[in-house]
């Protein structure tokens, strides 16, 4: 067995040895008054673990069947990490940040996107993030639904497979000492019946989580002078953010009417970052965007591939027809999206599988380009998953007081959402109606999209924004695109269409995880949305509800993509960043690994795309297009 020792090498033995977290110590327990039976256990995190502000790490714990109006016949332990504002925690608003997936833990938000810290170059410690969102807001990161990230149902010793992200029972068939891609540790049960299985069920859980935390978590609730709550999310968060906040709004109305016991939540802002919101509005863009509708001159699929995908999308019984069939059956037999009707689940899962394979698959399987960045190889090293190795360190687990390993992504959650076909479904009325209802209730909605993302690309998202039928929709659609300035350079970093409380922003030179690519731009957009400013300049604060951007009806700014980044195989992000030959070498113990990076072997020739033809002209003309389907 060949294993090369290098300076500061992390070989295959250390990740295995780091598997079982230490038993948490010095936890504080709060008995919930908001929901009898629920508890909060937490501890203050030492400064330096992530940032230098006061922060608290802990769990909101629900015994079986204790949540209000939520299917939950199993224990739920939801992990949170709360960072106080750097200015005045008592008066600054609260922003909840959740990642998508489904099954993506929110620690990527902490260490890669909006949190107070970034990973150091050697991935062994952290450095301050100068663009942290807690400059003027309290930040709450939540791993949800249960069995995502640090959240768990029942602590279970198991083996995690980095190749597939699948948990398996401990035993001779899953022996980390014989396979370097396996990690023995403590996780949730891996039981797909013990988590939320649809967006709406996750919303039901989340409402209970926020009810308990906002009322009972004393470091936040005591002496609170500002009770505004905002929710920001990305990717699958295009469904989570509007779906959750619309459900909160519905529950608020029921509480006000005396139909439900609970606290009215002061809903302020919904932020959607590169979110997949509505398939009917967005799916076709997954054909157009890589063909000729991106602004970087990249033609990632050829004419034959384009024709094949378009046929699969539009033919009788094709992708669009199957989406519509799923919606019709779900509306009739499972309108409240409990995910318990087999016929609906089957039809919706089938539609999801067909559209993924026959439409998205033309690009995903053929272009060798990034799912999250069309300008990069599919073995995209950015942003790095090195924070996962940091969270596996015993001293970090002790500081956070976590009894479980961090699972990201959670195959269990991803699988059960796929079984119900949740991605194809929409909740009652759809997520477009969720956004409309929130806007009509005077909740701000900010849609923010990096323009190099494929999977939830800005072209489809623009269609979503123009398809939201709310009271002020005509004024939003009439608004033009304005340049977005976020520093003193005089160079615009984005373009925005905004009318009043609703904005759609396209951010240049950014992929799916926009905040990792353009952190300063992302922070400014967040700050301006949260504090009732115009997104373009941050200078308009008066009568913002009547403000409209002026400019061209289409966002046509184009530029060449930045140079590609060479693929980097990261042990902790093996499934997405490593080629087959590298994974095989890790599995056999024949890889050289330095600070979690596989330095040998390199990926096999042909893994990344060779230069492809570009198109001189692309999709927009000078006339307003009709985006409404």
UniProtKB/Swiss-Prot annotation:
Extent of the signal sequence: 1-18
- Major enzyme class: hydrolase
Q: Give the main localization category.
A: secreted
- Listed as disulfide-bonded, the cysteine pairs are 326-355
- Sorted alphabetically, which keywords does the UniProt record give? Carboxypeptidase, Disulfide bond, Glycoprotein, Hydrolase, Protease, Secreted, Signal
**Annotated GO MF terms:** serine-type carboxypeptidase activity
Where is this gene product found?
A: Secreted
Residues of this chain annotated as glycosylated in UniProt: 157, 197, 405, 418, 463, 554
Q: Where does substrate bind?
A: 456
Spell out the catalytic residues.
Answer: 235, 453
Keyword field contains Acyltransferase: no
> Which reactions is this enzyme annotated as catalysing?
Release of a C-terminal amino acid with broad specificity
Q: Which family does it belong to?
A: Belongs to the peptidase S10 family.
Q: What is this protein called?
A: Carboxypeptidase Y homolog ARB_06361
Q: To which species is this protein native?
A: Arthroderma benhamiae (strain ATCC MYA-4681 / CBS 112371) (Trichophyton mentagrophytes)
